A protein has these predicted regions:
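Gly/Ala-rich beta-loop-alpha elbow adjacent to hydrolase catalytic centers
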Residues: 120-124, 128
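Short beta-strand/loop motif that positions the catalytic acidic residue
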Residues: 159, 165-167
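C-terminal catalytic histidine-bearing segment of alpha/beta-hydrolase fold enzymes
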Residues: 187-242
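A conserved short beta-strand
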Residues: 137-147
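Short alpha-helix in the alpha/beta-hydrolase fold that links the catalytic acid
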Residues: 48, 175-186
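Serine-hydrolase catalytic machinery in alpha/beta-hydrolase-like enzymes
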Residues: 5-111, 206-214
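Acidic catalytic loop of the alpha/beta-hydrolase fold
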Residues: 170-174
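Alpha/beta-hydrolase fold nucleophile elbow
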Residues: 108-121
C-alpha cells in the first residue's frame, strides 16, 4: 500500500494530504476522499485511509488546516476546527480543494475512473456533508459520528450524493435534535439519505482512544457494524444500486 504525501493549494495556505492506493492492483478504480477527525492528518487518519483503500479504492486523506499545522491536544484541535464549523463557506472551500486535488493527482497516475465518494469522521463527517451540500459530484457521502449542523442548509436538488450518517443515540455532541433537523433539511432538499443510530453508543465510537465519560468512547460492535455498512453503501453507490 502506498501513501504519497502531496502538498496542494488551499487558498492562501499550502495543505498536505496523502494519496493512498494499492500499487499491486491494476486498472482504474473509484476515488474516495477521507476527511479525518479534528486531530487532522495523523497516523490514525492514514490507517483509516489504508483500510478504505484495501477495498480497491484510491483514497485521499484531506488536510483542513494546512501543512505543518497539527494539533497536539483537544484544546488545539477545537481552536482550529470550531471556526471552520462556524464558517460553512470556508469549510466547503477547504474540503473542495482536497476533493479537486484527489481527482487531479489520481488522474495523473492513471488510477481512477469517474466514480467518487467521500467518508468523514467527527469533524470530517461534517466536512463531507458540507461538500455534498455544495453539490459536489459524489456517488456517496458517509458521515460517521460527524457534525450535522450547518449555517447553510442544502438547497432543493443540490445534493447529488446518496448520504449515510451513523451516530450513537446518547451522543451529546450530535443530539437527537440535530439528527431531526438534518432529516428535515435533507427531506426538504430532496436528498437520498440513510441514518443509523446505535443505542448506548457515545461520540467518536470508532476511535479506540476515545475515553471521555458521558461524552465519547470506543465501541467495538458499533465500529465493526459501521465499517460493514460503509463498505456496502459505497459498493452499492458505485454500482448505481442506491
Amino acid at each position: 500500500m502506498r501513501a504519497d504525501r502531496i502538498k496542494y493549494p488551499m487558498g492562501a495556505v499550502t495543505a498536505e494530504g496523502a494519496l493512498i492506493y494499492d500499487d499491486n492492483v491494476s486498472g482504474k478504480r473509484p476515488a474516495v476522499l477521507l476527511a479525518p477527525n479534528w486531530m487532522g492528518m495523523t497516523d490514525n487518519a492514514i490507517q483509516r485511509g489504508e483500510l478504505v483503500a484495501a477495498n480497491r479504492y484510491v483514497v485521499f486523506v484531506a488536510d483542513m488546516y494546512g501543512a505543518g499545522t497539527r494539533p497536539v491536544d483537544f484544546g488545539e484541535a477545537a481552536a482550529l476546527a470550531n471556526p471552520l464549523r462556524a464558517d460553512a463557506i470556508e469549510q466547503r472551500r477547504r474540503i473542495k480543494a482536497a476533493f479537486e486535488t484527489m481527482i487531479a493527482q489520481a488522474k495523473t497516475r492513471n488510477l481512477i475512473d469517474d466514480r467518487r465518494a467521500a467518508v468523514g469522521f467527527c469533524f470530517g463527517g461534517g466536512n463531507v456533508l458540507e461538500l455534498a451540500r455544495d453539490g459536489a459530484d459524489l456517488a456517496a457521502a458517509v458521515s460517521i459520528h460527524g457534525d450535522l449542523k450547518t449555517a447553510r442548509p442544502a438547497e432543493q436538488g443540490r445534493v447529488k450524493a446518496a448520504l449515510l450518517v451513523a451516530h450513537g443515540a446518547p451522543d451529546p455532541v450530535t443530539p437527537k435534535a440535530d439528527r431531526d433537523a438534518f432529516e428535515a433539511e435533507m427531506n426538504a432538499a430532496g436528498a437520498k439519505w440513510q441514518m443509523v443510530v446505535f443505542s448506548g453508543v457515545l461520540h467518536a465510537y470508532t476511535d479506540r482512544g476515545a475515553d471521555v465519560p458521558g461524552i465519547a468512547g470506543w465501541d467495538e460492535a458499533a465500529t465493526r457494524q459501521t465499517y460493514a455498512l460503509t463498505h456496502q453503501f459505497l459498493a452499492d453507490a458505485f454500482a448505481a444500486r442506491l
